Amino acid sequence: MQTKATAQEFSVITSRLSFALVSFGILLAAQLGAHAADPVAELASFSVFNNVDLAQLANADVKPMRGPAMNNARFQSVQTCWVSPGAPAQVASALRSFNPARHSELKVLLHTNGSNFSQLGSLPNNGPVEWLQNATAQKSNELQLSKEEAAKTAPFAQFWSGVLTARASAGVFGQPPYSNSSNSIRPGDEINSLLSEQPRIKKQFGGIIGSKGEQYWELLDVDNKGVLTLGSSFNKGMQIADVLYYASGGYYAAVTLYQLWPVDVGGKASTLVWRGDLLSSGELADLHGVERLGAESALIKDVAKSVRAFRSDSGSR
């Protein structure tokens, strides 16, 4: 059933989106004194959380909420917040060191910082990789490539190394369109549209996303299909943006935003964390009624699962 496949795709995407953070932390110290005196009020000013209780958040399981409705049928959003022990710099350090590939349930088969794609020649021998190899050899229309990329012929590792190298060099907003879509989807346009659909969030995080940031690439298991992705992480004060700007399948683009505030809970230095997930997927556009609701519920559950994995690893829960 289509909803099941879509839910599994979202599970991998949100797991990765949670914590692809590379350089954040030192800048926090300079921002603490100047930041808003009332984190709860600031949180309410741009999010779906109108009045949170910090003590309850510190002791409760994470409970993501559906974000405001968006006009584009391809788009979906989820927000969540929680309290972690320690100052923002400590929480940021834990985010940087979190490795989703260590959690088999998150289905991140490979994560590599930077833009060296030599590991494409020694990928694991499993079902998702075999699917990707066959799809590449057969020029499957399930692969999201430009017309120029699709026309190239080369061995698997060489082919994908060329595609990923060129796209990584182009940066977030320089991506060529996916030719397997009748709408000629450009990932950079999707990212801008996702943010424009959430004006309060766009205002809160204005200027944080640049061209390249701290780059990484991954191999994901999406419904037993291998998917190669490119992403970049950006930071600005106590804000983080993690942008997935290329995927060989499964979704068009995705953005995860984080805001961190220093708070005191029970006399202990803590950090209030807000996270917002914005996702564009062709699968979503085809879902209606019960199937659409099922996909939304699946995304909420998967965001919760990925946050729980981080909190468990970092000792936050």
Question: How does the language model describe each region?
Answer:
Residues 32-36:
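Sec/Tat signal peptide C-region and signal peptidase I cleavage site
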Residues 37-317:
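Eukaryotic helix-grip
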Residues 18-31:
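Bacterial N-terminal signal peptides
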Residues 3-21:
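Bacterial N-terminal signal peptides that target proteins for export
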